[in-house]
């Protein structure tokens, strides 16, 4: 497997840095120092130093965000692994100060899984948030702090073999979400479970929804469906090396979803697509439009994750989450999106049963 270049790492990490709200000047300065040296070891060291500085200045959440970049894209060496542990510790410090956020640990058949939760009580719908193959759960603090305003219970966790999740990534990974719901219990899940699964986590959610009626809706950005698993050589080195790390180099072609698989997904699926996506080709979301019973998507003229449209992506996803929760604020967000006028084209399909 080809390792990603520093230039490619910088491009992908830029999206994660912007999504976490890190200071653009600090990020640009750090990237310039890393590139100038040309030493791959400078990557985790530079970001870890920034994290340590934030921690010393009493800003644990900001420190966590820099540590997340230090482990990027996965803990391939001791420094990155240490940064991953530092990210968890810094987040834990922050959430204890913040209040209202709990740590949950699950010993599941698939493996050990950790999660952060907020407002997770019987009677509340559950919003299960899972990042992609690079994203750790500590990146999703805004979902946790918004739990009460969303009037939902929020659980943020990680994909198999990402962060603290010890489950292997591969053909049986679609059991992870059902196993988490089993651990939560029927009463907690009774008001519905809405999955926000980014990128490859969106694929897991689609795969799980084929056979788990507890999943009420799926909201995703740039989720793969089929072709990506059959032609890994066409993917960027960051993606292929990360997938190889998570899967132990196993063949992932069996994870591709067929047309029959997609037809079995009977819950609403909401999808943000990027027209210039270097990971997810257009055909992936076209398959969803052709075969998923209730599918709505929006397109941005952007690369993977639509980093140039973060505000619109968040508004569009939030509007759809609120709509599934029966919250009238969804209408207001829809009007705001229309006024912004940046959502580009998209569509809505209703496949006959």
Mark where each language-model region is.
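Catalytic histidine-centered segment of alpha/beta-hydrolase-like enzymes
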Residues: 74, 302-314, 332-334
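Short alpha-helix in the alpha/beta-hydrolase fold that links the catalytic acid
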Residues: 143, 267, 280-290, 301
């Amino acid at each position: 497997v080809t390792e990603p270049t520093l230039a490619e790492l910088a491009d992908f990490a830029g999206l994660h840095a912007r999504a976490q709200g890190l200071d653009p000047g600090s990020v640009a300065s750090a990237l310039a120092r890393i590139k100038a040296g040309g030493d791959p070891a400078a990557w985790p060291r530079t970001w870890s130093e920034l994290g340590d500085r934030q921690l010393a200045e009493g800003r644990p959440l900001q420190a966590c965000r820099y540590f997340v970049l230090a482990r990027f894209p996965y803990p391939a060496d001791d420094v990155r692994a240490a940064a991953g542990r530092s990210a968890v510790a810094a987040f834990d410090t922050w959430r204890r100060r913040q209040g209202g956020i709990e740590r949950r640990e699950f010993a599941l058949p698939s493996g050990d899984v950790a999660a952060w939760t907020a407002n997770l009580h019987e009677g509340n719908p559950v919003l299960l948030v899972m990042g992609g193959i690079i994203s750790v759960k500590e990146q999703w603090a805004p979902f946790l702090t918004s739990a009460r305003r969303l009037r939902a219970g929020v659980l943020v966790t990680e994909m198999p073999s990402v962060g603290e999740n010890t489950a292997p990534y591969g053909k049986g990974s679609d059991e992870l979400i059902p196993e988490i719901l089993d651990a939560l219990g029927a009463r907690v899940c009774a008001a519905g479970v809405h999955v926000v699964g980014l990128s490859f986590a969106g694929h897991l959610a689609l795969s799980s929804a084929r056979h788990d009626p507890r999943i009420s809706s799926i909201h995703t950005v740039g989720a793969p469906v089929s072709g990506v698993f059959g032609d890994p050589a066409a993917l960027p080195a960051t993606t292929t090396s990360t997938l190889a790390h998570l899967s132990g180099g196993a063949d992932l072609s069996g994870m591709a979803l067929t047309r029959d698989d997609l037809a079995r997904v009977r819950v609403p699926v909401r999808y943000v697509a990027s027209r210039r996506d270097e990971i997810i080709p257009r055909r992936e979301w076209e398959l969803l439009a052709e075969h998923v019973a209730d599918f709505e998507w929006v397109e941005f003229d952007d690369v993977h994750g639509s980093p140039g449209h973060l505000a619109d992506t968040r508004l569009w996803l939030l509007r759809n989450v609120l709509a599934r929760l029966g919250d009238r604020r969804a209408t207001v967000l829809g009007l705001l999106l229309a006024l912004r006028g940046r959502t580009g084209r998209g569509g809505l399909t209703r496949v006959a049963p």
